A protein has these predicted regions:
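P-loop NTPase motor core of the ASCE superfamily
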Residues: 173, 249-307, 460, 464-580
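Short amphipathic alpha-helical segments
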Residues: 65-67, 171, 380-382
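Short flexible coil/turn linkers enriched for glycine and charged/polar residues
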Residues: 61-63, 73, 88-95, 100, ...
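Extended, folded cores of ATP/NTP-driven motor/assembly subunits in large transport
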Residues: 1-132
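Flexible coil/linker segments and helix-coil junctions enriched in charged and small residues
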Residues: 20-51, 240, 244-253, 308-315, ...
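Conserved P-loop NTPase motor cores
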Residues: 28, 158-161, 166-181, 185-193, ...
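P-loop NTPase motor domains
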Residues: 106-161, 206-209, 216-222, 233-448, ...
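Conserved SF1/SF2 helicase motif Ia
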Residues: 197-199
Length: 580
């Protein structure tokens, strides 16, 4: 859109307005005297000319305004459609006219190197406005800009870029959308940019029953940059300490206290699960676990084993002897706790702790978190797969294992991302909801950016830490939702019904022909409807339909270079999407 402003001669404009005023006044009188009728057009011109002259005498300046809209399309049919659409955007008396005779000349007039005024020649097609009216016609009105850089979305109105800077600023992000609404594609775009900014990521993934998901292929494509944790094949030591050797002794002490507090919450979940009926037993168990953790980390043998494992590194003999849950279990006894007197309640609590922890040591999930870590936690992208779990407790404990990895990352890096995908099960456990709430509320101190993905806000709102989580998810992206979920967004997140109802319409699904998904961006209470256009190669990496996965696998086998293979498959995928 090009807009050229040229000052007009105020004297000529005043004379013209006076002539219009006289003519309109005369026409109105003649209509009334001869026909006993009212000349509406003459009276309208009369009022407008009087108002314009009033503004001129008060200091307004007349300005010629030449506006041209240049439309580019690769094909003539697309150009016709685009111009017709633009014409329909303007209601009478405003009018947009498509130039078909000398469009080349108008294009030439828009160039800054051409002296000729826009729409001034060969015919003067400029419109005359006053200074109070011109700003409304200038192409200055844009959707409110967010951050200066970051993850890019395109606004639906105006088509201008709007950014979310999760990489240089601390922001927690919530993503709400139904299945097949483009959530995973958008998240992969955010995570890719985070990796480019050297920000480590810990993600919780809920794969399909066959073990495949968006992030299995994505992590595999990342090669050494990614690590996919599967409980059936690998282990992640819950008691692995963060690497704090670069910090001061005082900072090390503070970080260890934070990590001990996390372990206490994790052990409470393992021992009590989601049951909190017996508060007295719960308090006794928490007290005993706290004492046991203090004795555990104060033991010189334990400290020496931690130090040797850290020095020799992953895969060494010392690493295989790093302290784990098995070692901690020995400290949950009378001998290590040094209790002067033991009542029935304490005895019952100790027996219960021993029983539950022994159960976890014998379970599949428990074995995965009670053995030395079998993969390097230095991989920038670390994905935990929550699959083949026998019950909700397994999911909760495995998520705690992922949380421990996220906490280790946070204590060792200035910025990190913790992403939870489809996590309704986890918020049924008070301890886990508390941990996520604590991370949302206090994660800024450790540089943790929390990204939550769900289909609706119900499960989050019903959790114990709902207020901590929802109040600190200051940035939200809402895609296509189910019509039955509208009430949840209105009641829980306080969205105006007329705004959020648009997200439940059929037209809000991702547009395959345009290769984009549609989103409502809520950034600090400012609502903007946006589109996300993924890179074709980005889309090719995370496409997870069975047919798409098969085609991608064939391309990867055919080409030695994985980037060339993805590029070829991307072109095939885009062609198939646009072809329907």
């Amino acid at each position: 859109i090009f807009c050229q402003l040229t000052a007009a001669n105020p004297t000529l404009v005043k004379n013209t307005l006076q002539r219009v005023l006289k003519q309109s006044n005369m026409s109105a009188r003649l209509a009334q005297d001869k026909n006993q009728t009212i000349d509406v057009n003459a009276q309208l011109k009369l009022r407008k000319s009087v108002a314009a002259q009033e503004e001129l005498y008060e200091g307004a300046v007349p300005i010629y305004n030449g506006i041209a809209i240049l439309v580019h399309r690769p094909q003539l049919e697309q150009l016709d459609q685009a111009t017709r659409y633009i014409e329909t955007c303007f209601q009478r008396p405003a009018q947009v006219i498509r130039e078909t005779e000398y469009a080349w000349k108008i294009w030439l007039q828009t160039l800054p190197i051409v002296w000729e005024g826009l729409l001034a020649k060969p015919f003067n097609r400029r419109q005359l406005y006053l200074t109070s009216e011109v700003p409304g016609l200038m192409p200055l009105v844009l959707p409110k800009k967010g951050d200066q850089e970051g993850f890019e979305l395109i606004t639906e109105e105006g088509g201008t870029p709007i950014h979310l800077d999760l990489f240089n600023q601390h922001k927690n992000l919530a993503l709400f959308a139904t299945t097949r609404a483009g959530k995973s594609v958008l998240v992969s775009g955010i995570l890719t940019q985070a990796l480019a900014h050297n920000i480590p990521i810990v993600a919780l993934d809920f794969p399909k029953p066959d073990g495949t998901s968006t992030f299995t292929d994505y992590t595999e494509f990342m090669g050494k940059e990614g690590a996919y944790f599967d409980i059936s094949k690998q282990s992640n030591n819950l008691f692995e300490q963060p690497d704090l050797h670069l910090l001061t002794p005082e900072q090390q002490q503070d970080r260890l206290l934070d990590y001990s507090a996390f372990l206490e919450s994790a052990l409470m979940t393992m021992v009590l699960g989601s049951s909190t009926d017996n508060k007295l037993l719960s308090q006794t168990i928490r007290s005993l676990l706290n004492l046991a953790l203090t004795a555990f980390f104060a033991d010189q043998t334990i400290q020496k084993r931690y130090q040797e494992a850290r020095q020799e590194g992953l895969g060494s003999m010392a690493w295989q002897h790093t302290p784990t849950l098995k070692d901690f279990l020995r400290f949950c006894s009378h001998e290590h706790l040094l209790l002067e007197s033991v009542g029935d309640r304490v005895e019952e609590a100790l027996n219960y702790i021993q029983l539950r922890l022994r159960f976890w040591l014998s379970s599949r999930v428990g074995k995965a978190i009670s053995a030395p870590s079998s993969f390097s936690s230095d991989a920038p992208l670390l994905v935990f797969a929550l699959r083949n779990l026998s019950d909700n407790e397994d999911a909760a404990i495995l998520s705690l294992s992922a949380y421990s990895a996220a906490l280790r990352r946070a204590l060792s890096n200035p910025a990190s991302i913790f992403f939870i995908d489809e996590a309704p099960i986890l918020f049924e456990f008070d301890q886990i909801a508390d941990l996520v709430g604590r991370m949302c509320a206090n994660g800024a101190k450790a540089g943790i950016r929390v990204i939550l993905s769900a289909q609706d806000p119900d499960t989050i709102a019903q959790s114990k830490a709902a207020s901590k989580i929802l109040q600190n998810l200051t940035t939200r992206l809402i895609g296509r939702i189910q019509p039955v979920a509208i009430d949840s967004f209105v009641q829980i997140l306080k969205y105006p019904r007329e705004i959020i109802a648009r997200n439940a319409s059929e037209s809000f699904f991702p547009r395959k022909e345009g290769i984009y998904s549609q989103w409502l961006l809520d950034d600090q209470g400012v609502y903007t409807f946006c589109r996300y256009y993924p890179g074709y190669e980005q889309l090719a990496v995370v496409a997870n339909n069975p047919q798409e996965q098969t085609a991608r696998q064939k391309a990867m086998q055919h080409y030695n270079d994985k980037y060339e293979a993805i590029s070829v498959f991307a072109r095939q995928l885009v062609a198939s999407l646009r072809g329907g």
